[in-house]
Regions:
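Absolute protein N-terminus
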Residues: 1-2, 100
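N-terminal helix-turn-helix DNA-binding core of bacterial DNA-binding proteins
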Residues: 2-39, 62-73
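Short amphipathic alpha-helical/adjacent loop interface patches that line ligand
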Residues: 24, 34, 38, 45, ...
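Alpha-helical residues within the helix-turn-helix
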Residues: 32, 43, 49-50
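Beta-hairpin "wing" of winged helix-turn-helix
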Residues: 50-60, 64-66
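Amphipathic alpha-helical dimerization/coiled-coil segments
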Residues: 73-100
């Protein structure tokens, strides 16, 4: 999970993940939508792929990129534990405020 956070801490990589949430894209499409050169987009995709967040498949002369759900599901489970804790604390605070 640490590598996921480290990888997503770079703003362009987070933007790539947000784009791929809509569905698979080619490297060129990602570069165009983010205003990056293809080498820059490829560099970010290599980092995302190394972290297990993105899968890149070569089809003819195109590289199709798509999200890999498992690392994102692990983050969701981890965040859910915080959400549950905060919900309980906010409920107690709400009850306390009503008693006042």
């Amino acid at each position: 999970m640490n590598s996921t956070f480290r990888t997503l801490a770079e703003p362009n990589r987070l933007r790539v993940v947000e784009l791929l949430r809509e569905g698979p894209l080619t490297v060129g499409e990602i570069a165009n939508r983010l205003g990056l050169s293809q080498p820059q987009a490829s560099k970010h995709l290599r980092a995302l792929s190394a972290a297990g967040l993105v899968e890149v498949q070569a089809i003819a002369n195109r590289r199709i990129c798509k999200l890999r759900p498992l690392p994102l599901l692990e983050l969701e489970v981890w965040l859910e534990s915080f959400r549950h804790s905060w919900d309980e604390k906010l409920d107690r605070l709400g009850n306390y405020m009503q008693e006042l």
